[in-house]
Regions:
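Amphipathic, small/basic residue-rich leader segments at the start of a protein or domain
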Residues: 1-119, 131, 136-140
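Short, conserved phosphate-binding/catalytic loop or strand-edge motifs used
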Residues: 119-126
Length: 142
């Protein structure tokens, strides 16, 4: 992919501008893409249908919350949880570049990032907990 005159992000000879996803991130990326396709996409229309009939336009319909909680449980069970955290103990140890590829996939579906515990403001709060939280707080919240 060209990003300017003579600059290609996937050109292996240009190490200073290598913006390709690392080989180590590929399995997680593939798992996220698969999860979105098989778990998130099939319930997205229902999620939006429920949102259109909610009483509180500042909150979620109870059915929407149920959909999200079920997706979150499945994601956590598959290990697709907190992978945006750079620390390999609490996250996947991804670089910002590798996470960018995954975030791009999350951005294609309006409920994907929430389903995989990667949406604001939660991500920022978890980053703080990762850095300064007690072991007990990390165990409970991360």
């Amino acid at each position: 992919m060209a990003i300017g005159p003579g600059l290609h992000i996937d050109d292996p000879s240009n190490e200073s501008l290598n913006l390709a996803m690392s080989d180590g991130a590929r399995p997680l990326y593939d798992a996220v893409v698969d999860f979105i396709a098989t778990e998130v996409e099939p319930v997205t229309l229902e999620f939006h249908r429920l949102g259109a009939v909610r009483d509180d336009h500042w909150g979620y319909h109870p059915g929407q919350l149920d959909i999200l909680e079920k997706l979150k449980a499945k994601a956590r069970e598959k290990g697709l949880w907190n992978f945006f955290l750079p620390d390999a103990e609490t996250g996947e140890g991804l670089s910002n570049l590798d996470y960018a590829y995954i975030a791009a996939e999350l951005g294609k579906n309006p409920i994907a990032s929430e389903s995989l515990n990667c949406s604001a403001p939660d991500t920022g709060n978890m980053e703080v907990l990762e850095r300064v939280g007690t072991p007990e707080q990390k165990k409970q919240w991360l």
